[in-house]
Swiss-Prot record:
It is an enzyme of class 3 (hydrolase). It comes from Mycoplasma genitalium (strain ATCC 33530 / DSM 19775 / NCTC 10195 / G37). Its EC number is 3.1.-.-. This is Putative esterase/lipase 2. The keyword Membrane does not apply. Pfam families: Hydrolase_4 (PF12146).
């Protein structure tokens, strides 16, 4: 069993390694979530026999921790970097959601030669945390003509999201430290995250956003990230919010396939 420190990295790890491939993927989950949030995408990766690793960050899922030193964004970055180096991984493609997207960008800043490409899903950035309470409540509870079909079809998912929110609230003492650290990192002028986004440069990067995201503002994020690199490919999925990989897994995967096909043609 792996633990969350510099010697043995994670308390929980899930790996799919069918055979040696040129690329290896690492999934990085978001704040208050866990790697199971990618489960619908895992099944599509398995069908392609693409190798991947994923794990729960300290304080998330079954990786319990109340150590405030471990509940910091930079600690998560160190853990991922150490994991990649210790496993001697190359041609790594990081797939990071929300907070995990920020971790991915920061990892690329530290060990850029190990990272082949970035797939950022509603990534935390300097436009994040402009959350409107009314929009959150409307997303969960308000039904109207424009969203009726989506509301009915995703009733179980809505309940699941509420469950996650309730569980996060129950663990608010644990997440208080991490949340404060995230907000600090996402502030305009935070040199570390700002430089990390600027260092994307020519690195092949796909950004997938939900049109109805209440956490990572879609248009503001596109404007912000496009200013950091003109090589970023943006895909916006209509009718979904902060977790497009879970709400629209097939379309999400199609975008990933298209991105990887282009990557192959460009011989990165």
């Amino acid at each position: 069993m792996l633990t969350s420190n510099k010697n043995t990295l994670f308390n929980s790890i899930f790996a799919f390694k069918p055979k040696k491939r040129k690329n290896v993927f690492i999934f990085l989950h978001g704040f208050g979530s866990e790697y199971a949030s990618f489960s619908r995408i895992f099944s599509l990766f398995k069908k392609k026999k693409w190798p991947f690793f994923t794990f729960n960050f300290p304080g998330h899922g079954d990786n319990e921790s109340t150590d405030t030193d471990q509940l910091k964004l930079n600690h998560f970055v160190d853990l991922v970097c150490d994991f990649i180096v210790q496993k001697k991984l190359n041609n790594v493609i990081l797939i990071g959601h929300s907070m995990g997207g920020a971790v991915a960008v920061l990892v690329n800043k530290v060990i850029p030669l190990k990272i082949k490409a970035l797939i950022l899903v509603a990534p935390m950035n300097q436009t994040s945390f402009s959350v409107n309470k009314k929009r959150i409540l409307d997303t969960f509870f308000k039904r109207n003509n424009s969203n009726h079909k989506d509301f009915v079809e995703h009733e179980e998912k809505r309940k699941s999201l509420l469950k996650i929110a309730i569980n996060a609230f129950k663990k608010r003492t644990t997440f208080k430290t991490l949340y404060s650290d995230m907000v600090q990192n996402a502030k305009y002028g935070n040199d570390s995250l700002e430089r990390a986004y600027e260092m994307i440069g020519n690195k092949p990067t796909l950004v997938i956003l939900g049109a109805n995201d209440i956490v990572t503002p879609t248009k503001a994020s596109v404007d912000y990230l496009a200013n950091k690199s003109d090589k970023i490919i943006f895909k916006v999925i209509d009718g979904v919010g902060h977790s497009p990989h879970d709400s629209a897994p097939k379309l999400f995967f199609d975008y990933v396939l298209e991105f990887l096909d282009n990557l192959k043609k460009q011989r990165y």
